């Protein structure tokens, strides 16, 4: 493949095959640096099969290089355990489809030549923006087509595979590409999705860059009568398990430690998270396959970062160990092209511990597992606009009912001193259930602002943050995945109404997220959540009537609300599919949750979210930039000093004559330290 292509060559190209090669040329020169392209070529050609001068990869070479297990999937019913995620055939199907871009209908499945692999890497690492001005950053329709394997014409797939095989070696290609036969990788025709016209932007932009729109339109008109495509649950599950396992993968990090020799517990945890995502689809979709409209809506709204792990996975092609200068300096010789280097996992790579974003602290999580954190990374926002792992976010343990007890005083002491966004995770089961793992329900909420008493609910921030990271999220992880994104209208106002705060906290009623708080209830609260104005300081009497307290408690509002009682023993998730876009949250996606879920809480945890240093350092009163952990420790030290000071003052009150006692008492009452006014003070610090 040449380094460049002349304009006359582009004008002379008229067939999809010629235009496909020219697009690969343009991708290679515009989307990779010269060094990356050199490494890419070395990786490809040092491993490629050669049949009469035709160089290509088969499934085994691709799986071995990416360290994606390609063995026989071990079913639990068969007994035994091979520690593998059998995703190799699925990845190969995807790559064979994407290699034909933008002529998937006439050229897919494609043989994995260097030109095809160039397009695959550009598409999966989202580097196409350097060439395709009109290209959209979501690849949902393209990825759906690469996975669709239900509802296709077997005759067409067989013909396409035979045509592809003839262009290479009939004997070798048929032997090595057994998984490709019967793959349904042509373009889906689920044209009832609302945004189907916009979803062709990538392909249109690609052909527009080559002045070949008419050829593309001709290709799109071929075979409009093909059956509606669907993704089988088995295919989707295997891909999900791979994505969950490699979600923490960093650029050029060894993949082996995430995909090989998983323990039975680790593989079961990965499978459980995959099953909760699959359970969010309808019974018909689970039985007959997932259609494009449902797939696109679910991925776009509730799993926007699902395919992010594919980026660092395929970026491995852009670095060759054969060209590692440090190895050359030590005198190590390069493997010869006739003997392709083996990508078998080494013991050192397998034994190396996977990356974790959970920091050590006052407790170890009784809820979160590495697979669950991977699940969270598929939809939780970050200020960078990327997922949790790619944003270098860390989770700091702040509060746990297991470690700190179920006291709201302890909750205030640990949570209200955390001056950064946080993640609330609740795990429990339905009342009367046995509490087995299959019956556990896991709920959570992303709180974008610190828990603190405040006289303002402003969304103004000194940093230019990504909008999604400034919105709250309510979600359920188990037994069915579902997400309620924050209402974007929250970003359009500086003051959030005091009757509908994001979070409301009271020692009387507990914790309420996304609820409506009656004005009468605000007069009786003792603590306040983020963005909730403090009431006027007026003396009041506590209500003793239980019924009266219930009437003044937070009420479910909008599309979703979470209410946790003051004893941290029970939780209620309220879902409304008729509320449209009113309230703090937008409707649940997928819409599979019951309207009311009542659970007995087993564990409740708060995890602080620490952004990269450039974003998480905020100045203190002296103008010194400090992270959230340091500021929390300083708050605890201040509280401890205040407690000692007050203790000393109380001792002095006991001595002296009555006049001195009354004067000291009056002084403390005016300061709000003791007396009725002290009872009304918000509990931001304890």
Swiss-Prot record:
Pfam families membership: TLD (PF07534)
Location of this chain's protein in the cell: Cytoplasm
Ranges of compositional bias, category Basic and acidic residues: 155-176
Transmembrane region(s): none
Ribonucleoprotein found in the keyword field: no
All residue ranges annotated as the TLDc domain in the record: 366-610
Region of interest called Disordered, as start-end residue ranges on this chain: 155-198, 326-355, 522-559
InterPro entries linked: TLDc_dom
Regions annotated as coiled coil: none
Bias kind Acidic residues: ranges: 188-198
Stored PROSITE patterns: TLDC
Biased composition range(s): Polar residues: 544-553
UniProt keyword annotation of Cytoplasm present: yes
GO cellular component labels: cytoplasm
Domain of life (superkingdom): Eukaryota
Keywords on record: Cytoplasm
Principal location: cytoplasm
Family, similarity comment: Belongs to the RTC5 family.
Job of this protein: May be involved in a process influencing telomere capping.
Protein name: Restriction of telomere capping protein 5
Name of the gene encoding the protein in the UniProt record: rtc5
